[in-house]
Amino acid sequence: MKNLSFINKLIYSANIIFALVLLFSFALPFFPPKTFSILSVLNLGVPFLVLCNVLFFLYWLFQLRKQLILSLLTLCLGYLMFGSIYKFSASKKIESPNNFKVMNFNVRLFNVYDWIPENNIESKIVDFVKTEAPDILSIQEYHPHKNVNLSFFKYKYEHVSGKKIKYGQAIFSKYRIINSGSVEFPNTPNNAIFVDIVKGKDTIRVYNVHLESLRINTRIEVLKTEDSERLLKRAGSTFKMQQLQTELFLEHKKKCKYRVIVCGDFNNTAYSYVYRKIKSDLNDAFKEAGNGFGRTYDFKFFPVRIDFIFADEAFKVNGFKSYNAHLSDHYPIMSTFALDD
């Protein structure tokens, strides 16, 4: 740092801090949240930390300074461990007579509390689903709204609870459902539900997983006034709950004898412990066939992917689409799969 100006020394000092924090974030998915519960919040900030390190790298590159090596090596390590946060390749789209489409969508109770200041959001969601025509629809924060008619799906399983407003999870299917159930999580309305569907000669299990929410208000004026210590403690407690919920789900899943598709809102990113554990040897449909950031949540500061569709290796991932439909605080995603005859 001897040959750096005072300003560049300050910038490089900041560069070191951001690189070290990002490196630490890369290690967190390999440790249970109960070990570093509060620090696990860094998982949510990985896209931001990556962006900062890209900017540092470009800054030093334009000056032809060797300080670029720090962020370059950090970013390369992250790429080797997790892949890129942005997929530059075009979305894969393979047509096949065996194709079927699976959509995941957290509908936020069909806007029953008017979070979005528009009329008929529930009808717009129904119209959107009808237009995109998934064969299987996985919904989190489902509410049996009087104006919601999804009868174009022949089969469904819903699990709802609540006194004043009933809500929960639901799976709709154009294929026959022969079995269904719920994996209950303690002390929360969140859960995981499943259905076994028959498609041709195959029986497929589809899970819909909704892990504990951080309950963070993304409005800037609210975040500015919220106590940071209380926010971190709440996040740490949430990550511990997510770990327990993940363990309960995986215990149920390992008893399944069918090929599996896992959909859900994990309320955590692809750099988290719960993502790594649930994904395990499954394929992330976005990584296989998507493009761009794959944003699934309306966070104001940077693109966040917290909703996922996974499938075991028996399924070919023939397509993936992230939608920019502003009908909830989440964005819908849909994957196209195929099973060989």
Predicted regions and their residues:
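N-terminal, active-site-proximal structural segment of metallo-dependent hydrolase catalytic domains
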Residues: M1-L150, E247, D340-D341
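Metal-dependent phosphoester-hydrolase catalytic domains
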Residues: N8-L22, A27-W60, I69, E251-V260, ...
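Structured beta-strand-rich core segments of catalytic domains in phosphoester-bond hydrolases
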Residues: L75-P97, S123-D127, D135-N217, K321-A325
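Active-site beta-strand/loop signature of hydrolases that rely on acidic residues for catalysis
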Residues: K101-V107, I121-N147, V195, R205-V209, ...
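Acidic/histidine-rich helix-loop elements
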Residues: N104-N120, R215-T238
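Active-site environment of divalent metal-dependent phosphoester hydrolases
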Residues: L109-Y113, H143-N147, K163-K166, P189, ...
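Short, solvent-exposed loop/turn segments at secondary-structure boundaries
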Residues: Y113-N119, V183-E184, Y297-K300, Y323
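Short amphipathic alpha-helical segments
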Residues: N149-F152, I220, Y273-R276
